[in-house]
Curated annotation (Swiss-Prot):
Originating organism: Coffea arabica (Arabian coffee)
Residues the record lists as binding Fe cation: H215, H269
GO biological process, one term: photosynthetic electron transport in photosystem II
Annotated localization: Plastid, Chloroplast thylakoid membrane
Main location: plastid
Matches recorded under Pfam families: Photo_RC
Annotated residues for binding of pheophytin a: Q130, N143
Full protein name: Photosystem II D2 protein
Family from the record: Belongs to the reaction center PufL/M/PsbA/D family.
Main function: Photosystem II (PSII) is a light-driven water:plastoquinone oxidoreductase that uses light energy to abstract electrons from H(2)O, generating O(2) and a proton gradient subsequently used for ATP formation. It consists of a core antenna complex that captures photons, and an electron transfer chain that converts photonic excitation into a charge separation. The D1/D2 (PsbA/PsbD) reaction center heterodimer binds P680, the primary electron donor of PSII as well as several subsequent electron acceptors. D2 is needed for assembly of a stable PSII complex.
Length: 353
């Protein structure tokens, strides 16, 4: 039996190899295969947002002014969600709603679905970009894993939550004041601040901020002095290969402060990764629960006692009354097509207000 040994030769003009060589070439701005998703989607998402906040009204969907052209500023302009009557339509420009009419498409809220979907794929493309670059330079993929947390929050809030409700209308509009209103909506209709997943998210974000502040200050405090410059930046050579701070000194300091301290840098930095990422993941999971209208903590015994005893009140019962007020105002304003009329006896009342 004869075995022929030889080098397998591919066609030098293979289209995939040509594209791979060009996309992954070392240049000032890396493109990569992920860039085929990232750059177009980011361009269209940002372009749609700037177009909407500059020119497009929300009169036909929310009865609001939402563009610079109508007198809004950076904090009050927004790309608003489609009307509730349009449910979960993708609102394609060539779809049955707009029928290819760009002006009508903007009036119906088509820019919101355009920005939301391109924004989601743009964020995913950015995560893939980090993964692709990490593979290219033989790094571990923890940057991409960390970036999955804000992606999870974006997808859960802007896509999964409204999919669980009656339409895109109940997603946040893309604007600063619009996001604030959405937060108030979440509180009034879902009692979000008393949701354990929100609590884990807050603990993760604020805990991460605390860890960053402590870590940065500790590193600055324990820097090795290897120059006589006036400050940190002048006293050190930015290309030095040696260790720049003393982990041993930092460990001794925090051992005395707290009684415990991180013993090595790997565990320390993994913890700084774990806290915010887990917090954001948990928060995203909580929003998925809200899409299904799962409730937060209910302390019914306190509500019953507060209803029976005008002298009994807790911060919880006060907040419940505030939530009722938010619902009474927002439901009538946000859903005028429902013709919601609240009689006096169902409006918030009691010794809390």
């Amino acid at each position: 039996m004869t075995i022929a040994l030889g080098k397998f030769t591919k066609d030098e003009n293979d289209l995939f190899d040509i594209m791979d060589d060009w996309l992954r070439r070392d240049r000032f701005v890396f493109v990569g295969w992920s860039g085929l998703l990232l750059f177009p989607c980011a361009y269209f998402a940002l372009g749609g947002w700037f177009t909407g906040t500059t020119f497009v009204t929300s009169w036909y969907t929310h009865g609001l002014a939402s563009s610079y052209l109508e007198g809004c500023n950076f904090l009050t302009a927004a790309v608003s969600t489609p009307a509730n009557s349009l449910a979960h339509s993708l609102l394609l420009l060539w779809g049955p709603e707009a029928q290819g009419d760009f002006t009508r498409w903007c009036q119906l809220g088509g820019l919101w679905t355009f920005v939301a979907l391109h924004g989601a794929f743009g964020l995913i493309g950015f995560m893939l970009r980090q993964f692709e670059l990490a593979r290219s330079v033989q790094l571990r993929p923890y940057n991409a894993i960390a970036f999955s947390a804000p992606i999870a929050v974006f997808v859960s809030v802007f896509l999964i939550y409204p999919l669980g409700q009656s339409g895109w209308f109940f997603a946040p509009s893309f604007g600063v004041a619009a996001i604030f209103r959405f937060i108030l909506f979440f509180q009034g209709f879902h009692n979000w601040t008393l949701n354990p997943f929100h609590m884990m998210g807050v603990a993760g974000v604020l805990g991460a901020a605390l860890l960053c502040a402590i870590h940065g200050a500790t590193v600055e405090n324990t820097l090795f002095e290897d120059g006589d410059g006036a400050n940190t930046f002048r006293a050190f050579n930015p290309t030095q290969a040696e260790e720049t701070y003393s982990m041993v000194t930092a460990n001794r300091f925090w051992s005395q402060i707290f009684g415990v301290a991180f013993s090595n840098k790997r565990w320390l930095h993994f913890f700084m990764l774990f806290v915010p990422v887990t917090g954001l993941w948990m928060s995203a999971l909580g929003v998925v629960g809200l899409a299904l209208n799962l409730r937060a903590y209910d302390f019914v015994s306190q509500e019953i006692r507060a209803a029976e005893d005008p002298e009994f009140e807790t911060f919880y019962t006060k907040n419940i009354l505030l939530n009722e007020g938010i619902r009474a105002w927002m439901a009538a304003q946000d859903q005028p097509h429902e013709n919601l009329i609240f009689p006096e006896e169902v409006l918030p009342r009691g010794n809390a207000l």
